Amino acid sequence: CLFTDFGAYGNRVISIPMYATNSPAQIEYIINDAEIHTLFVGEQLQYNNAFKVQKESAVLKRLIIFDPAVKLNPEDKTSIYFDDFLRLGDNAHAETTVKIRMNEASADDVATIMYTSGTTGESKGVVLHHFNYLEAMRIHDIRLPMVNDKDTSMCFLPLTHIFEKAWTCYCLHKGVKIAINQDPKMIQKTLPEVHPTLMCNVPRFWEKVYVGVHEKINSSTPFMKKIFMDAIETGRLYNLEYKNKGIEAPFCLKAKFKFYDKTVFTLLKKVLGIERGRLFPVAGAPLSDTVNEFLQSVNIPIVYGYGLSETTA
């Protein structure tokens, strides 16, 4: 996705992402609505669905396939594997043409069209220009001066999410190392390997964390359960009733919180693989007050916000 995105941007081509799980009908709608003539696909199912659409399409001309293990349909005479696609440029002698295109690029150029799920009817194509990204980066530079090239961001959401796409672009702008999790089912294994300092995510991820932690607490001994619950309540009082309100906490509460933060909370975050976490933006859907309160209580650095796709958020 990132390869093709930046390759497209460099040639003033509009990038239009789709979900890997899109049905042939959904693919066909987007192809026709946006008049897409070239489509990049991943594994076998994506190829099969895309080729089914191409056979009936007057618009879609070529599929470019990332996965070399994909078997082409015997009727397919136009598709090409990604590595072979790259080699087409070896003798294209297109450097001058590309330089001219890049020099003519403008912030007013359309960068991408994001087809959101919507609540009714067909997907809506949200048109985003390069100035949308530039403005997002400008304001993030002001609001998030702590993000730097020492950070590692876990790219967990699909890059069809403008939330993840804009965040990943911002991280690249700041020199942040990007770790891409390709299989959502592997995130519990990936996080302890990567130890991200940054990660944007949707509430559903943190809801699963909340449920998992409370299942562990409820299955522990009465003594340990009492310790965990006291730690969470201490964190709630310190962070929500004092720190977040700009009020100096009583000495005893501050000392108790520091103890739990260095023991219970640090152990919890190490198990999850997020002990180095500095900033975890959360958006895309409502985050329940219960989960939000829990995350802040155990000192997980979430920042909860909202925005429209039209605002690059």
Model-derived regions, located:
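Conserved AMP-binding/adenylation subdomain of ANL enzymes
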Residues: L134-C155, L159-F265, R276, P301
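Conserved A3 ("GATE") glycine/threonine-rich loop of ANL adenylate-forming enzymes
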Residues: R204, A283-V291, Y304-A313
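Short hydrophobic/charged patches on amphipathic alpha-helices used for structural packing
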Residues: I27-E28, K99-M102, Q188, K269
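Adenylate-forming
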Residues: Q44-V59, W206-P222, K262-E275, D289, ...
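Conserved AMP-binding
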Residues: Y19, F156-H161, G284-P286
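Conserved pre-ATP/AMP-binding loop-to-beta segment of ANL
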Residues: I80, A92-Y115, E122, M146-T152
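Structural core segment of the AMP-binding/adenylate-forming
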Residues: G10-L88
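A short helix-loop-beta submotif of the ANL/AMP-binding
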Residues: C1-I16, A20-P24, N32-T38, D151-T152, ...
